[in-house]
Amino acid sequence: MAKKIEKSAKKKFREKVLLGVAHIQSTFNNTIVTITTNKGNVLAWSSAGACGFKGARKKTPLAAKQAAENAAQTCVSQGMREIRVNVKGAGAGREAALRGLRDAGLNITIIRDITPIPHNGCRPPKKRRI
């Protein structure tokens, strides 16, 4: 007769992080929100596409706010209170994502704009002809 093997699963230890860093990448087609610790370890992430928005609706401010709220709610449930924000990109969801973080219950301390600005580097995309 076979013996039963008892497995004892270790509980994953999650340390309480009170201060986090939110990285908001707002492109012309999507908005991605990643919340990390001060060291850079990812705690939660969300994007407009991951929230169920498809196609042209991903670039809307409503989708960006929803993505920020989803990422922030998981961190608030783990005990996070304050957050520093790094914003990158020139999309429509920049300010809406900040509102989503605030509405989820996080206290925003610093907002930094880290959009990369070329010193005449790569050639930009051609102008649209409609």
From Swiss-Prot:
Top-rank taxon, per record: Eukaryota
SUPFAM superfamilies reported for this sequence: Translational machinery components
Keyword Ribosomal protein recorded: yes
Pfam families (alphabetical): Ribosomal_S11
Compartments, record wording: Plastid, Chloroplast
Record GO biological process: translation
Gene Ontology cellular-component annotations: chloroplast; ribonucleoprotein complex; ribosome
Keyword Magnesium: no
GO MF annotation list: rRNA binding; structural constituent of ribosome
Keywords on record: Chloroplast, Plastid, Ribonucleoprotein, Ribosomal protein, RNA-binding, rRNA-binding
Subunit-structure text: Part of the 30S ribosomal subunit.
PANTHER family in UniProt: 40S RIBOSOMAL PROTEIN S14/30S RIBOSOMAL PROTEIN S11
Similarity section: Belongs to the universal ribosomal protein uS11 family.
Protein name stated in the entry: Small ribosomal subunit protein uS11c
Annotated organism of origin: Chlorella vulgaris
Encoding gene, per UniProt annotation: rps11
